[in-house]
Regions:
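Lumenal/extracellular ectodomains and adaptor appendage modules
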Residues: 1-177
């Protein structure tokens, strides 16, 4: 996913919770840029949730720490290069690799903060899913999402860099098994 926002710090975290209590704790942390809940008795949070890429304005941001805490699994990023960008709008790119039970038949992505411009890609080529589709719900002036799909491979949702969307917006990917 990628979007634009004003950053307030040169360090931030991406978190993965195993229950609602942990997720609530991650939501309360102002340094948590993205959070996810990973449910399933056979899943191991450190193994089944991976941050593949974290970039700001096209630059890779290094992992400075990754650990399991009372809030779940936390992956911390930071760089001295980000200090001049504090209180400025930047383009954030996050790529996550995670497992999701096919039987749930949905994959929701929610926005908790005002966001300008957006790109969300859902790759399912190796997941053996059928009839994959996206339902978006964007709060804003007149946000019009462009949806493109590669049958059997991926769906991409994009909003122009000129469009703002507001909290409680998002997209739900739905499929048949």
């Amino acid at each position: 996913m990628e979007y634009k926002k004003t950053i307030r710090s040169d360090t931030f975290m991406i978190g993965c919770a195993s229950d609602r209590e942990q997720l609530d704790a991650l939501i309360e942390d102002e340094h948590c840029e993205y959070r996810w809940i990973l449910g399933g008795s056979d899943l191991v949070i450190e193994r089944d949730f991976t941050v593949e890429k974290m970039r700001i304005d096209g630059e890779d941001i290094p992992i400075i720490d990754a650990k399991k805490t009372h809030r779940g699994y936390e992956v911390w990023f930071g760089s001295e290069k980000l200090k001049p960008k504090i209180n400025r709008e930047v383009k954030i790119e996050i790529e996550i690799l995670t497992k999701k039970a096919k039987g749930n038949r949905t994959f929701p992505v929610y926005l908790l903060y005002p966001t300008r411009g957006l790109e969300i890609k859902f790759h399912y080529e190796n997941a053996n899913l059928r009839n994959v589709r996206a339902e978006s719900f964007f709060a804003g002036r007149h946000p019009q999402a462009a949806v493109s799909s590669k049958r059997g491979k991926s769906i991409e949702i994009q909003l122009s860099n000129e469009e703002w969307v507001f909290p409680t917006s998002g997209v739900i990917f739905i499929w048949d098994v």
